[in-house]
Amino acid sequence: MNNQKQQKPTLSGQRFKTRKRDEKERFDPTQFQDCIIQGLTETGTDLEAVAKFLDASGAKLDYRRYAETLFDILVAGGMLAPGGTLADDMMRTDVCVFAAQEDLETMQAFAQVFNKLIRRYKYLEKGFEDGVKKLLLFLKGFSESERNKLAMLTGVLLANGTLNASILNSLYNENLVKEGVSAAFAVKLFKSWINEKDINAVAASLRKVSMDNRLMELFPANKQSVEHFTKYFTEAGLKELSEYVRNQQTIGARKELQKELQEQMSRGDPFKDIILYVKEEMKKNNIPEPVVIGIVWSSVMSTVEWNKKEELVAEQAIKHLKQYSPLLAAFTTQGQSELTLLLKIQEYCYDNIHFMKAFQKIVVLFYKAEVLSEGPILKWYKDAHVAKGKSVFLEQMKKFVEWLKNAEEESESEAEEGD
């Protein structure tokens, strides 16, 4: 037996090719740019031909790797340096957004080019979104005309869903806001967006990314008021956006009022303090009394754990509401407020089945406590009620309404005799 180790064969002199997947391709955006610009130069300004060229080139060129360069070219005509400037020594093309005509129709046509490209190569979605976010941060480096074109294009792309409204975060950049660039850009953007859709669709998109309550941040802190926002955008021809923001602020103020009101009630704060607070909030946020009485009613009804037994809940409700009558009475100084309260009571009793038999008792209690008066009660009975539980509640109120009518007639005849 040979104990010597057998010599293993050597592979000297052999050359091996690296597997393709192991090769690191050099990152060369300049070469990619030259290929795209050459192709765009050949297609000219025919955007149909541009879209076809981009579609075909995706099979030969690495769009995934050079997405940023691709979108720089299509928007600005070439690769952008930090700050948004085009390098002087680089190739550039006039077949781009910034070199096109400054009108909505042209930007709509360019939007179609982007739509087709991203539909064809879905992986470009993220790169495009990132590219637009970057372009928005570079706004100061662009001319006013270039900013206007980009704003119109972005508005159209937001409307057709190619872009997500989260890209608007870039507009809250401190320097852009401070110099008024963000607000001016937003005017053009929202005009084209609302032109494609309506304000409700715009609002839904903003809500989806929690941007609906941030629009005032387009202005510096010392100008972040509803008054300044509505004046600026109304004068720019965007009254619907101004009204939307005003409504958003009102809704926010109402929610805050209800939250604070419930906390004050649970603490057992004196009614005079609660009334004072609510009246200050009404004045500060321009909330009308009929709206406030609805908030007060909801707050009052949410402060108690109701009995599940129908025969006991009416008694519990009367006892509870008797206690809160002075608070409710403070916000039914107008006929419309009383009518609103009646409708709120009707809806509540219908939605909470244990309260179905308590409706008339609540109304009578409020009449005696001077929360409600005969005029609004009679109007509610005649034609101002809603459909919810209508037949049940009208039947409950029949005798009381007859008594009110008789009392009213007696008062009128007494007044005539006095004359």
From Swiss-Prot:
Keywords: Acetylation, Activator, Isopeptide bond, Phosphoprotein, Transcription, Transcription regulation, Translation regulation, Ubl conjugation. It comes from the Eukaryota. The modification N-acetylmethionine is found at M1. Translation initiation regulator which represses repeat-associated non-AUG (RAN) initiated translation probably by acting as a competitive inhibitor of eukaryotic translation initiation factor 5 (EIF5) function. Enhances histone H4 gene transcription but does not seem to bind DNA directly. Residues 1-15 have a biased composition (Polar residues). This is eIF5-mimic protein 2. Residues 247-414 form the W2 domain. InterPro entries: ARM-type_fold, eIF5-mimic_regulator, W2_BZW1/2, W2_domain. GO terms for biological process: regulation of translational initiation. It holds the Pfam family W2. It comes from Pongo abelii (Sumatran orangutan). Gene3D superfamilies: 1.25.40.180. The keyword Transmembrane does not apply. There is a cross-link at K368 (Glycyl lysine isopeptide (Lys-Gly) (interchain with G-Cter in SUMO2)). One of its GO terms (cellular component) is cytoplasm. CDD domains: W2_eIF5C_like. Residues 1-26 are annotated as: Disordered.
